[in-house]
């Protein structure tokens, strides 16, 4: 099995995701969105889809750099802003983040990264409240399955059009959407500290893990069959452990059931049935 097996009909994917954005916004009673523009491929793809679905006047991009953020990230975010002609604001997070960092040791990179991600989430939701825009997420399927993201940080949003696309599929969609090539070919990075890269953090490439996840989820192959495809056992075991261990990140908070009608369990009226007022 090869990574090419993950290829999709990206014309169809585009149509489905544009309809998703348009219809979900209507159901929620919104007409515009706000999203973080990091300069990476995921936010670029979501921004492009939002403009095609809603019109550029209904899309606001926030650039939220920290002092150590790379200039390349800002340049690539601005490249998308100019390409699409959307509204954009730059809101540096350095003053807020540094107030937290004063009590977090420099070698605690995970804690510091989480603080940065959650600070950006606060800004996105504040702009949502200010302007009446729906916060749109940019986490891809690979990140969500592996738990490679910050709970109530970059994983927080009201809707997410690319959450069922593996990273390699996001790249394929990006080429279909004519996203600028520099954003597609650069090494993926959350840009949480200088020199940080996703694949260095994870210890494997997106191509390798996407193929493994595809076999585990979409093909529903067991361990024996997957190892028969040339996947090394330690790699399989590590990825499976990450998927299982991070299930809590893919769920709403679990509620202890005490009554006959519990929110999120058996009190679940579909919002589609309700008239938006």
Curated annotation (Swiss-Prot):
InterPro entries recorded: NAD/GMP_synthase, NAD_synthase, NH(3)-dep_NAD(+)_synth, Rossmann-like_a/b/a_fold
Keyword hit for NAD: yes
Gene Ontology cellular-component terms listed: cytoplasm
Keyword flag Membrane: no
Signal peptide extent: none
SUPFAM superfamilies named in the record: Adenine nucleotide alpha hydrolases-like
Keywords: ATP-binding, Ligase, Magnesium, Metal-binding, NAD, Nucleotide-binding
Superkingdom of the source species: Bacteria
Binding site for ATP: 36-43, 138, 167, 189
Sites where the protein binds Mg(2+): 42, 143
Biological process according to GO: NAD biosynthetic process
Molecular function as annotated in GO: ATP binding; glutaminase activity; metal ion binding; NAD+ synthase (glutamine-hydrolyzing) activity; NAD+ synthase activity
Assembly information from the UniProt record: Homodimer.
Family from the record: Belongs to the NAD synthetase family.
Function: Catalyzes the ATP-dependent amidation of deamido-NAD to form NAD. Uses ammonia as a nitrogen source.
Name under which the protein is recorded: NH(3)-dependent NAD(+) synthetase
Source species of the chain: Pelodictyon phaeoclathratiforme (strain DSM 5477 / BU-1)
């Amino acid at each position: 099995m090869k990574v090419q097996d993950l290829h999709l009909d990206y014309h169809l994917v585009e149509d489905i995701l544009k309809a998703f954005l348009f219809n979900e916004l209507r159901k929620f009673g919104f007409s515009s969105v706000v999203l973080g523009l990091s300069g990476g491929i995921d936010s670029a793809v979501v921004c492009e889809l939002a403009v095609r679905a809603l019109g550029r006047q209904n899309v606001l991009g926030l650039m939220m750099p920290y002092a150590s953020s790379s200039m390349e990230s800002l340049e690539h975010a601005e490249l998308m802003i100019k390409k699409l002609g959307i509204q954009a604001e730059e809101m540096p997070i350095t003053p807020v983040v540094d107030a937290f960092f004063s009590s977090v040791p420099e070698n605690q990179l995970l804690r510091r990264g989480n603080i940065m991600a959650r600070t950006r989430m606060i800004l996105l939701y504040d702009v949502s409240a200010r302007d009446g825009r729906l916060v749109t997420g940019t986490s891809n399927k690979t990140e969500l399955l592996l738990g490679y993201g910050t709970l109530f940080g970059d994983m927080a949003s009201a809707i997410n059009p690319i959450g069922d696309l593996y990273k390699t599929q996001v790249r394929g969609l990006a080429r279909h959407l004519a996203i600028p090539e520099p954003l597609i070919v650069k090494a993926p990075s959350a840009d949480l500290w200088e020199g940080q890269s996703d694949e260095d953090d994870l210890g494997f490439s997106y191509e390798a893990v996407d193929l493994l996840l595809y076999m585990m989820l979409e093909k529903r192959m067991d361990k024996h069959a997957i190892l028969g495809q040339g996947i090394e056992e330690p790699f399989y075991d590590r990825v499976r452990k990450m998927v299982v261990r991070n299930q809590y990140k893919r769920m709403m908070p679990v509620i202890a059931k005490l009554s006959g009608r519990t929110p999120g369990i058996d009190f679940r009226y579909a919002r589609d049935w309700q008239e938006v007022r």
